[in-house]
Amino acid sequence: MMSDFSEELTKLAGAEDNPETSEFSKTRMHFPWLQKHIEAVVTGGKKRKDFAQTTSACLSFLQEALLKHQWCRAAEYMHSYLQTLEDSDTYRKQAAPEIIWKLGSEILFYHPKSNVETFSSFADRMKNIGVLNYLKISLQHALYLLHHGMLEDANRNLSEAETWRYGEKSASQEVLIKLVQAYKGLLQHYSWSKKKMELSELDEDDYAYTAKSRNMLSQSSKTSTNICTLIKTPGVWDPFVKSYVEMLEFYGDQDGARELLTNYAYDEKFPSNPNAHVYLYEFLKREKAPRAKLISVLKILHEIVPSHSLMLEFHTLLRKSETEEHRKLGLAVLFEVLDFSGCTKNITAWKYLAKYLKQTLMESHREWVEEEWKSRRNWWPAFHFSFFWAKSDWKADAELACEKAFVAGILLGKGCRYFRYILKQDHETLKKKIKRMKKSVKKYTIVNPGVHT
């Protein structure tokens, strides 16, 4: 059944760049002990046991080759592993098609000698062998075609999958069919977006504008039908939600877009998803929603991902709030952003913290600063303010080093090694800033005089 593909794999297995020197360059097997055992497919006795052990070993070698990105070697192992489709063990025989598809598609995606025809041929054969995996394979095949810019072929593939049925429809089949339909919707959205771009270049009084508008409306109706069912099912459907919201907004259905995004973010049936809150926030921002509403959305995002890039925007909203609780949270948000290693070089975060520390202390809220510092005093000095980081930061970005030095001085006192190192540096442009920083640290530091760190 897989003989044609097996031959193709054999060719791929020998497709090294240097066929004369590569140990995997020939079209024959190079593992005689493996070939001998695998070809001994019988129904009982020692050989049956040997077959199971050998195919298991073959799978391990195959996985190892994939992990090392040895695509030609993996193709050769796959050529052998195909024999497991004839395994006498029912469970292994049923599991084989899915394993072969997952590993085989990975090989064909990356193999230097593979092409669309080879991949498609493999996908079509696997659909017929692993009927229970038909929808998954069809969907992944369509995504592969999309990756290669073959939109019409991908759409045709999805249309065939949409009408496919096998036995009684299970719950998992139902979700996969919805997913197939939704991806069709994404393709339709792509066509709709292109028409939208073309429409923006036409005069509204032009006949072509009216005709294209009607065409777009028809396209959006199809897209809605295909996407709607899926996004009502609990799950993470970011690209589908974004596409649908874009169309709702374009046609002026703000209420529909708001309801969809609110449900996507807050419905307890859906898994926790930071992006759902991001999309809702961005929509409300476009609507010019009140600050309190924006804060309430970002507050939940902050609880899920305290290092999210929107946290600096969240801080700005909190800082401008008239509520003391919000302004206090604004300080905590900055500290929490800088708790993460990926944010240590974020100069905007350090600028915001330096400025807000000074403002907070000027407004006599020293206890806010001390509360945040209490849980960090044992690890932030080494994490942010060591002598090593002082030299490294100054060399890489003097402006960043100045902002950090001010924060270090406020939190650790003027005896802090980071602060002292930056203070001694000679920089024509930053000379005045460093002088002002020295005065501010002396005035606002939360450390008692004489304490050195």
From Swiss-Prot:
GO terms, biological process: transcription by RNA polymerase I
Pfam families: TAF1_subA
Residue ranges of the TM segments: none
One Gene Ontology cellular component annotation held by this UniProt entry: RNA polymerase transcription factor SL1 complex
The keyword Transport is assigned to this record: no
Keywords: DNA-binding, Nucleus, Transcription, Transcription regulation
Main localization of the protein described in the UniProt heading: nucleus
Description of how the protein assembles with itself and partners: Component of the transcription factor SL1/TIF-IB complex, composed of TBP and at least TAF1A, TAF1B, TAF1C and TAF1D. In the complex interacts directly with TBP, TAF1A and TAF1B. Interaction of the SL1/TIF-IB subunits with TBP excludes interaction of TBP with the transcription factor IID (TFIID) subunits. Interacts with UBFT. Interacts with CEBPA (isoform 1 and isoform 4). Part of Pol I pre-initiation complex (PIC), in which Pol I core assembles with RRN3 and promoter-bound UTBF and SL1/TIF-IB complex.
Function of the protein: Component of the transcription factor SL1/TIF-IB complex, which is involved in the assembly of the PIC (pre-initiation complex) during RNA polymerase I-dependent transcription. The rate of PIC formation probably is primarily dependent on the rate of association of SL1/TIF-IB with the rDNA promoter. SL1/TIF-IB is involved in stabilization of nucleolar transcription factor 1/UBTF on rDNA. Formation of SL1/TIF-IB excludes the association of TBP with TFIID subunits.
Protein name: TATA box-binding protein-associated factor RNA polymerase I subunit A
